A protein has these predicted regions:
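C-terminal structural segments of small proteins and small subunits
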Residues: 85-102
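Short S/T/G/P-rich N-terminal loop/turn motif that feeds into the first structured element of a domain
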Residues: 1-50, 56-63, 70-80, 98-109
Length: 109
């Protein structure tokens, strides 16, 4: 896994995807494990700066993923990887909710 040391300017430069997922009842551990297994191969992708999955301390079925890519093409490339397709193929059916929201850096007008 590549070292993740970034200056603030690096972190406000790229393409962010914020993902909120909620596992179906009884599926939370499987989903959590699958997200953990995505970290290393995703961080090894050339278009990825950060891939940070989190679990809610208040609701063990709720997860938040912060993804930072070099650009939108990096996100598109990620969705074509074998590890992402394997996750989507087995995990989407275990989710009650999945919401993905992309963001770009804020610049004052």
């Amino acid at each position: 896994m590549k070292a993740a040391k970034y200056a603030p300017a690096d972190l406000n430069n790229g393409f962010v995807v914020a993902i909120e997922i909620v596992a179906k009842a009884g599926e939370e551990d499987a989903v959590g494990h699958a997200l953990e297994m995505l970290i290393e191969p995703t961080m090894a992708e050339p278009g990825v700066k950060l891939f940070l999955p989190y679990r809610s301390p208040a609701n063990s079925r709720a997860f938040f993923i912060f993804e930072l890519y070099l650009n939108e093409q990096g996100w598109a490339a990620h969705q074509q990887t074998g590890h992402f397709k394997a996750f989507a193929g087995t995990m989407l059916q275990r989710l009650e909710k999945r919401e993905r929201v992309p963001y770009v850096p804020y610049t004052a007008a």
